[in-house]
Amino acid sequence: MEFEIIPLALKKINQRNIPIEWVKQALNLPEQVVEGYEGRQVAQRVYHLSGKKMLLRVVFETMEDKKVVITAYLTSQVDRYWRKP
């Protein structure tokens, strides 16, 4: 499925030094998708940065035939956001 990144999200992604390729990976091959606020979904993938486990969370909405990225951020609080099956 195609995706679009809204301008504010792209600005935040760049400010946070998150590679666009990581955002694409999270959307196309998420390790987990969880429910977010207001019907949004959050695609999640774990990355290792400087030996530290980090969780990339990409918040998106599905509109017609594409995913629209609202924001994305990295967090070290993997256990807080990761949902156990």
How should these model regions be labeled?
Residues 1-85:
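Ribonuclease/tRNase effector modules and their secretory precursors
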